[in-house]
Amino acid sequence: MILDLSDGTVLHELWTVQRLAYAVEAELIGFDGIPPLHESLDELRACDETFLGLYDEEGLAGAVSYRLDGSTVDICRLVVHPRAHRRGIASKLLDALPDGPQVVSTGTRNEPALALYRKRGFVETGTREVGPGVSLTDLAKQ
């Protein structure tokens, strides 16, 4: 379902899940400077991404955001609440994205994310350093 970030409750749920999810990634990659980890509610509300969310009995379990670049789906964020890990939430969210080629970037040391994308047919297209000792891996799927 599309998340309406003009709804304060939805916005706060997303912000909370995002902070929890990126805290896990920060620990995995040894870098706490991930921009969404430090994003304010106002910054999140103002971003130009479309968000899809998946709820379970406890609330928002995960979300994915994207931008369309022509026919290419640029995946901006994929976050899963730590309580919902290993339940297929990320795969369900990726399944809900629009059809077309997809691109995504993730921390090079985030092995769980890389494994998920590889399993779903993404191939690595490059790596770039974004800070001292911190790199992102770019992936694409046709």
Regions from the PLM with identified roles:
Residues 76-86, 106-108:
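A short, internal acetyl-CoA/4′-phosphopantetheine-binding micro-motif in the GNAT/acyltransferase core
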Residues 16-47:
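Conserved GNAT-fold acetyl-CoA-binding loop/helix
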Residues 103-105, 123-138:
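Conserved catalytic-core motifs of GNAT/GCN5-like acyltransferases
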Residues 53, 59-68, 72-79:
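Conserved beta-strand in the GNAT
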Residues 1-16:
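A short beta-loop-alpha structural element at the N-terminal edge
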Residues 42-53, 74:
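A short helix-loop-beta-strand connector motif used in the catalytic cores of GNAT acetyltransferases and
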Residues 94, 99-112:
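Conserved GNAT acetyl-CoA-binding A-motif
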Residues 54, 83-96:
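Conserved acetyl-CoA pyrophosphate-binding loop and the N-cap/start of the following alpha-helix
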